[in-house]
From Swiss-Prot:
Modifications the protein undergoes after translation, according to the UniProt entry: The GPI anchor is essential for its antiviral activity.
Chain's role: IFN-induced antiviral host restriction factor which efficiently blocks the release of diverse mammalian enveloped viruses by directly tethering nascent virions to the membranes of infected cells. Acts as a direct physical tether, holding virions to the cell membrane and linking virions to each other. The tethered virions can be internalized by endocytosis and subsequently degraded or they can remain on the cell surface. In either case, their spread as cell-free virions is restricted.
Quaternary structure note: Parallel homodimer; disulfide-linked. May form homotetramers under reducing conditions. Isoform 1 and isoform 2 form homodimers and also heterodimers with each other. Dimerization is essential for its antiviral activity. Interacts (via cytoplasmic domain) with ARHGAP44. Interacts with MMP14 (via C-terminal cytoplasmic tail). Interacts with LILRA4/ILT7. Interacts with RNF115.
Keywords assigned by UniProt, alphabetized: Cell membrane, Coiled coil, Cytoplasm, Disulfide bond, Endosome, Glycoprotein, Golgi apparatus, GPI-anchor, Immunity, Innate immunity, Lipoprotein, Membrane, Signal-anchor, Transmembrane, Transmembrane helix
Membrane topology: Single-pass type II membrane protein; Lipid-anchor; GPI-anchor
Protein's recorded name: Bone marrow stromal antigen 2
GO terms, molecular function: metalloendopeptidase inhibitor activity
InterPro entries the UniProt entry points to: BST2
Glycosylation site list: 66, 93
GN (gene name): Bst2
Gene Ontology BP annotations: defense response to virus; innate immune response; negative regulation of cell growth; negative regulation of cell migration; negative regulation of intracellular transport of viral material; negative regulation of plasmacytoid dendritic cell cytokine production; negative regulation of viral genome replication; regulation of actin cytoskeleton organization
Main location per the UniProt record: Golgi
Location relative to the cell: Golgi apparatus, trans-Golgi network; Cell membrane; Late endosome; Membrane raft
């Protein structure tokens, strides 16, 4: 038998085998499925994460709003307290001013009283000095009076002695001398009396 030759007609370059396209399609579908399988969990995770983040954000926002409200309330309270404290401070300042004024007045009054007391003490000291001087003068006067009394007593004693002597002289003259002699004796007595008076005045 003569050999048979199988002759294949050459295919154009644009034409490919039908199995190749199916493979590519399968690969594309598989890749799409894989991508979908990967993307869906990512989307779910992102949604969950976003939802939790949103919730957390809302919670944080609520907390922030609550804290801001609390802070505003505290601020208003602190402002009210500050206003009350300022009012109390103003009243305290007024009371302090009034107390200072009253204290200054009292201090001035006390100083005036002290000055008066010092003046009175000085006057009392002067009066005491005057009293002491007067007492010394009185003592001197008493001593002088006592001396005068002693002198008077001496003079009285001398006068008594003189009178006794005169009596003796009179009796003696009356007994021994006549009437003329009595007249002469009376003249002598009168002369003696005249002499005794200046002596008394001298003492």
């Amino acid at each position: 038998m003569a050999p048979t030759f199988y002759h294949y007609h050459p295919l154009p370059m644009d034409q490919k085998e039908p199995g190749c396209g199916i493979r590519w399609r399968c690969l594309a579908a598989a890749s799409v499925l894989i991508l979908v399988a990967l993307v869906i969990p990512l989307i779910i995770f992102a949604v969950k994460a976003n939802s939790e983040a949103c919730r957390d954000g809302l919670r944080a926002q609520e907390e922030c709003s609550n804290t801001t409200r609390l802070l505003q309330r505290q601020l208003t309270r602190s402002q009210d307290n500050l206003a009350q404290a300022e009012a109390q401070a103003s009243t305290c300042n007024r009371t302090v001013v009034t107390l200072q004024d009253s204290l200054e007045k009292k201090v001035s009054q006390i100083q005036e009283k002290q000055a008066l007391i010092q003046e009175q003490e000085a006057q009392i000291k002067e009066q005491e000095a005057q009293i002491k001087e007067q007492e010394a003068q009185i003592k001197e006067q008493k001593a002088h009076i006592q001396e005068q009394q002693v002198r008077i007593q001496k003079l009285e004693g001398e006068v008594e002695e003189f009178e006794q002597k005169l009596k003796k002289l009179r009796t003696a003259e009356e007994a021994s001398i006549t009437s003329k002699q009595n007249s002469a004796g009376s003249m002598a007595v009168s002369s003696l009396l005249v002499l005794a008076v200046p002596l008394f005045l001298l003492f």
